[in-house]
Amino acid sequence: MINKNISIQINGEPFNCSEPLSLQFLLNYLDFNSERIAIEINSTLLPERLFHSTYINDQDKVEIITIVGGG
C-alpha cells in the first residue's frame, strides 16, 4: 500500500497529513469545540451532523469560523 500525503488549507494556512481524516477528528486534533464553530469545505457550509461522516480530501480548502457571543 502506498501512503500519499494529503495537503489541505485550513483558514488559508497549509496543513499536511498522511492519511484521510474525518472532519471531526481534525477538529479534535486542532482543539476546536464543534458546538461553537461553523465549517466550510471548498466554499460549502457543512451542518454539524455531518462532521463525523465527512472526510477531508487532498487539496480541500477548510474554513473554520469560531462563533463568539457578545453584547
Swiss-Prot record:
CC terms in the record's Gene Ontology section: chloroplast
Key words, A-Z: Chloroplast, Plastid
Alphabetized SUPFAM superfamilies for the sequence: MoaD/ThiS
CDD domains: Ubl_ThiS
Cellular localization per UniProt: Plastid, Chloroplast
Domain of life: Eukaryota
Family the UniProt entry places it in: Belongs to the ycf40 family.
NCBIfam families linked: thiS
Protein name: Uncharacterized protein ycf40
Species assigned in the record: Porphyra purpurea (Red seaweed)
